[in-house]
């Protein structure tokens, strides 16, 4: 087969040549309903990712370090060549393991989360320990974890983020959009309507081309008023579930605790849009504090890490545009006054596990979340982990698919980029499929889903229920069903 070139979401050119698979266990057809996503199914996005996208991404990592070699030599001296060679060799080996569908290997280096990973890998049933036979979530997370381990175990490059330039470029090329959004969102009054618009802007920024097209304006159009926000109405025709009212009502309820946990997704422009929303929330007392949960290591190309947060704020503070620079300074103040904080980094977010096991596998993190008013999970990967990477009936209720994971009230905001979805009206998924067979991977459709927690019945394993319901009067509610969309915003 002749090589084909496609451009991935970060603009990388990826060769999609296929080599012969030695895997005899693959199945024709798409992933069946009520199964885990997996590279076993040849008509799935998981298969395409493992067969074509991941080798391409690994090739790009190789090119990045090789191209950076002169700069690295200048910084670290000639000895860094040895690191680069070892990293390149290790990535080539990993490509080969993936191509031959080899068993996952244990971690033996300096990885701080190696014990958790090794325990997880050895508990997987043997037939589910190879790239194409495993659940896609396990295989994909394992690949990103292995890639960073090569850097982590090197002498000079243990902090090297091989994706940082992509996140930075994404922000830099979004300058015009950032200016418009910044101007349009200064001093917005506290209304549901404004919150709703900001939520939708934020959602659509998870669809990666947004910064290039969605908010472009002609010269004659006003660039600094609320009409800019009204533009989002044009692009949310394809919002399949919209629980924004429930999210607003959750934040508006009186109660002692107004912390919001924000489980971040991508850096670059998406993080800028996240901050616009979060700034609005703290400025208007919709949250007393926001805790950003970022990734401990470079992850899924564009995911946000602590250095990305620092770089972004610093970039804005020193921007020549006055409005962006003022915004950067304001956000720096929100961070130094701890209105917005970076939560202690947890390796659970860069583990392979779905969120319903968090209570058993990372009780500390689970406890942190129980201590907040609302946890917002942003993006497709977080959604997959909430759903357990499982093909539910598309009309199944969000609350059911969480499989008991309800440390606090939960909101998921994501554009649909893989075959996992729930909470849709009966028949909608079939209609969408008839009209557009790529609807589940295009990122063109979105969901904002919400469910409240049942604090009063929540106990940690081996403990009495230690969360007293009287501490949560406003949050103790009957189980919520699927949202009807007919709710009225408080206030
Ligand atoms: O940035 P997001 O929204 O989490 O998207 C990442 C997702 O995109 C993909 O690359 C394609 O679905 C998946 O690997 C992953 O779930």
Question: Where do the model's predicted regions map?
Answer:
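Non-catalytic accessory regions outside enzyme or core folds
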Residues: 2-259, 444, 449-491
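C-terminal functional extensions of proteins
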Residues: 3-38, 294-296, 303-491
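Conserved structured core elements
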Residues: 48, 137, 241, 271-275, ...
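Gly/Ser/Thr-rich loops at beta-strand to alpha-helix junctions
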Residues: 134-138, 263-272, 297-299, 380-385
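Short, flexible loop/turn elements at secondary-structure junctions
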Residues: 147, 264-268, 296, 414-417
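Residues at the starts of beta-strands that form the adenosine-phosphate
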Residues: 259, 287-291, 409
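Structural motif
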Residues: 259-261, 373-374
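Histidine-anchored nucleotide/phosphate-binding helix
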Residues: 269-291
């Amino acid at each position: 087969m002749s090589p084909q070139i496609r451009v991935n979401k970060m603009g990388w050119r990826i060769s999609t040549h296929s080599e012969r698979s030695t895997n005899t266990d693959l199945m024709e057809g798409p992933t069946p309903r009520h199964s885990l996503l997996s590279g076993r199914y040849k008509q799935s996005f998981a298969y395409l990712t493992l067969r074509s996208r991941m080798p391409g991404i690994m090739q790009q990592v190789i090119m990045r370090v090789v191209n950076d070699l002169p700069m690295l030599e200048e910084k670290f001296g000639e000895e860094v060549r040895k690191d680069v060679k070892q990293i390149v060799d290790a990535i080539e080996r990993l490509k080969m393991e993936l191509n031959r569908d080899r068993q996952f290997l244990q971690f033996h280096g300096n990885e701080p989360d190696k014990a958790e990973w090794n325990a997880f890998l050895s508990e997987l049933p043997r037939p589910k320990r190879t790239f194409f036979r495993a659940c896609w979530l396990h295989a994909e997370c394992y690949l990103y974890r292995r890639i960073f381990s090569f850097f982590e175990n090197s002498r000079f490059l243990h902090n090297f983020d091989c994706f940082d330039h992509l996140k930075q470029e994404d922000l830099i090329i979004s300058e015009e959009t950032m200016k418009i959004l910044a101007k349009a969102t200064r001093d917005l009054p506290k209304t549901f309507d404004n919150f709703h618009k900001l939520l939708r802007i934020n959602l659509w920024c998870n669809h990666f081309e947004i910064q290039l097209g969605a908010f472009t304006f002609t010269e004659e159009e006003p660039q600094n008023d609320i009409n800019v926000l009204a533009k989002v109405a044009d692009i949310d025709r394809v919002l399949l579930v919209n629980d924004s009212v429930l999210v607003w009502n959750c934040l508006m309820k009186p109660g002692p605790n107004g912390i919001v946990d924000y489980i971040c997704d991508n850096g670059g422009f998406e993080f800028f849009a996240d901050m616009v929303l979060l700034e609005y929330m703290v400025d208007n007392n919709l949250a007393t504090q926001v805790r950003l949960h970022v990734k401990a290591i470079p992850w899924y190309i564009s995911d946000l890490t602590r250095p990305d947060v620092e770089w972004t704020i610093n970039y804005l503070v020193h921007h020549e545009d006055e409005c962006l620079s003022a915004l950067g300074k304001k956000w720096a103040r929100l961070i130094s006054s701890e209105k917005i904080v970076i939560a202690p980094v947890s390796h659970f977010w860069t583990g392979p596990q779905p969120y319903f096991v968090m209570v058993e596998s990372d009780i500390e993190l689970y406890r942190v979340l129980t201590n907040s008013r609302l946890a917002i999970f942003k993006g497709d990967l977080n959604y997959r982990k909430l759903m357990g990477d499982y093909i539910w009936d598309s009309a199944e209720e969000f609350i059911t698919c969480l499989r008991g994971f309800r440390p606090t009230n939960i909101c998921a905001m994501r554009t649909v980029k893989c075959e996992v979805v729930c909470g849709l009206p009966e028949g909608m998924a079939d209609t969408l499929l008839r009209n557009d067979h790529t609807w589940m991977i295009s990122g063109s459709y979105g969901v904002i889903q919400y469910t409240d927690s049942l604090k009063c019945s929540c106990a940690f394993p081996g403990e009495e229920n230690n969360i007293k319901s009287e501490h949560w009067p406003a949050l103790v509610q009957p189980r919520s069903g699927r949202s009807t969309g007919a709710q009225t915003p408080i206030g």
